[in-house]
Regions:
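Catalytic core of nucleotide-activated saccharide and alditol-phosphate transferases
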Residues: 1-96
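Short, polar loop motifs at secondary-structure junctions
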Residues: 4, 36-42, 109-116, 177-180
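Generic structural signal for helix capping and beta-alpha/helix-loop junctions
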Residues: 8-11, 63, 116, 155, ...
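A local structural micro-motif
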Residues: 52-53, 107, 146, 174
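Conserved catalytic-core segment of nucleotide-activated headgroup transferases in glycan assembly
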Residues: 59-143, 153
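Catalytic binding pocket for nucleotide-activated donors in carbohydrate/polymer assembly enzymes
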Residues: 118-187
């Protein structure tokens, strides 16, 4: 079994929500591959009887995700759809700095951003960047902003694929803090 959203799965198991997995089924798997590592693996074993829980983190193909050599276009950028839970962090880490640094260029790329957001004039909004253009996008950033979903922040050890994409393309990453981050990107 490969669980690509272990923090959500655990919340559902704890709530006895059996939408796609029941607690009784977990011990039946030979392996439980988890998007999340760290203490979550022991919890899967202890609380739900997973026989062999192993971390199987997101990854990128380095032949696709690599620096493109394009000139830097933006000082700071974020790639991801609008989510209300990330709005405050994005405002604090991107929108507000953009307001205070009008001579710098910023970019937000993703779907579902409401028209009601008051973007500063130096923030470019791109509605969609197809996966085939992610390497180009990240390569043109001086800094890439990584914002982690709330349940993944609480669980830790849950790196998103966007984090690895940005790193593989040579972008300097500014990220919120979560347990385990330093094991993926040691000092």
């Amino acid at each position: 079994f490969y669980d690509i959203d272990t923090p959500v799965t655990l919340a559902k198991l704890d709530a006895r929500d059996e939408e796609y997995l029941s607690p009784a089924l977990v011990p039946a798997f030979d392996f439980y591959l988890s998007f999340t590592g760290g203490p979550t693996l022991e919890r899967l074993r202890r609380d739900y009887g997973a026989r062999l829980p192993w971390p199987f983190y997101c990854m990128v193909d380095p032949s696709i995700y690599r620096p493109t050599g394009e000139p830097k276009r933006w000082d700071l950028g974020y790639l991801g759809p609008h989510r209300a839970v990330r709005h405050r962090a994005r405002g604090r880490l991107l929108t507000e700095p953009a307001r205070h640094l009008p001579c710098r260029r910023f970019v937000v790329a993703g779907a579902q951003y409401p028209d009601s957001i008051d973007w500063p004039g130096n923030v470019e909004l791109i509605e969609h960047v197809p996966p085939s253009a992610h390497a180009s996008f990240y390569s043109r950033l001086r800094f890439a902003l990584n914002l982690t979903r709330r349940n993944m922040l609480a669980t830790g050890w849950s790196p998103s694929v966007r984090l690895f994409e940005a790193a593989a393309c040579g972008a300097v990453i500014l990220s919120d803090r979560w347990e385990g981050l330093d094991s993926f990107f040691p000092e």
